[in-house]
Amino acid sequence: MTSKIMNKIQKKEKPNDVIYTPNSIVDLMLDFCDYKEGQSVLDPCKGKGAFFDKLSEPKDYCEITENIDFFDYTKKVDLIVGNPPYSILTKWLDHTMTICDKFCYVIGMYSLTPVRLQKMEENGFYITKILLTQVPTWFMRSYILVVEKGEKKPITFDYKNIGNKCLYCERPCGGMKNVGHCKRKATDTECSY
């Protein structure tokens, strides 16, 4: 199956769906979701491997540019961790809940809608941890969510200001006034300082 997102990537109609997650956010997410070696983990949109390369076996990935479509993936895994494409987030969450009992995603603050929360609860999934992040080189605040299937539990909430550092090289940058000294693009994975 060739998904619409692959067609958009090839035609560059929706370049905002291709944003590589910086290592500092990947490390933060893996720590925040209590990732343990030995868990079966899926990186649903591998990109250049920021998540995948830090995971131990058993691990698997999907990558639409390699014709490995997330929506065709049916194996059960212990954990899914990644940065999903926002333009199809509802469909993405629906499929996520069919193949795992726990997932950790970074999503834009305004993407956590009542409709999505209700749909998760209808499927027995609840947010167990939420981290609000302010990343100066991203255009909005983001949530790192840990969502688990099972009984509703109290939510752990925290806030982390990533600071005015380039996410790619850790050198100071001007945040939103000056998106970064390194002249990188959202699709770059390394600083070009």
Where are these regions (language model features)?
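Class I S-adenosyl-L-methionine-dependent methyltransferase catalytic core
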Residues: 1-177, 181-188, 192-193
